[in-house]
Amino acid sequence: MKFKRPVYFDNINLVSIILLPLTLVTFIFNSFKKLSLKEKFKIKTICVGNIYLGGTGKTPLVLKIDKILKNKFKTVIIKKKYLDQEDEQKILKQNSNLICLGDRKKALMNAVKKNYKVAILDDGLQEKGINYDISIACFNSSDAVGNGFLLPAGPLRENLGELRNYDAVFLNGEKNNIKFLKVIKKIKKKLKIFQTKYVPINLKSFDLNKNYLFFCGLGNPNEFERTLLKYKFKIKKKKNIS
């Protein structure tokens, strides 16, 4: 869900330390969710999620996976319905088959009834009651894990150690975060790690001698700005509503 990221998410400071005892609530809540019986569906499932609260590049990766697989399989993207995420839902619907319901399990049952062969879930790693065939955790290479604390003291939805239960990590963004890569590799040696960068596909259609208004309505505004600056865009004004 969309939110304005607190400044204290980035580094350990007085506010994050004061809120640290409240992370016990998140830890206990996560522990209870792990007790859920995992349900297996008659469809191959790929979950692309994150443990960092914020834009980590999930949706572009979901669309890319769908684009590759739909050449050979009947694919569908599943996204849990939130009223404040209609923009993302529209993007997914324009580029793929989409089932968007308030319950992921019901969405998967719907996909099975419609004879889809592969379901790609946009978010859902914290849905412990589903037995995914492949689970992928996304990170932004610059933000990494922020101050490293669980919510509400930090940006983590679950402990970094949960990566040992997942199949792959995608580190998305401009920064080559070697330090964070080393941390990930220590958690699970056989974890597949992929590094990606954002590349504009229509760069030639822009006049880089002109000034531009920076407008971001979804995703990670900081990463979007870094990408524009990398490709020499002159940003005159900024407007961020994501």
Task: Locate the predicted segments by residue.
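Phosphate/Mg2+-binding loops and adjacent switch elements
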Residues: 83-188
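Residue-level signal for inorganic ion chemistry
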Residues: 25, 59, 92, 122, ...
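Conserved beta-strand elements of the Class I
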Residues: 76-78, 137, 212-215
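A transmembrane-helix-recognition feature enriched in membrane-embedded lipid enzymes
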Residues: 2-44
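C-terminal accessory "lid"/substrate-recognition subdomains
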Residues: 2-5, 144-242
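Rossmann-fold NAD(P)-dependent oxidoreductase module
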Residues: 64, 68, 122, 227
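Walker A (P-loop) phosphate-binding motif
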Residues: 34-84
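Short, highly selective alpha-helical patches that border small-molecule cofactor pockets
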Residues: 58, 62, 85, 89, ...
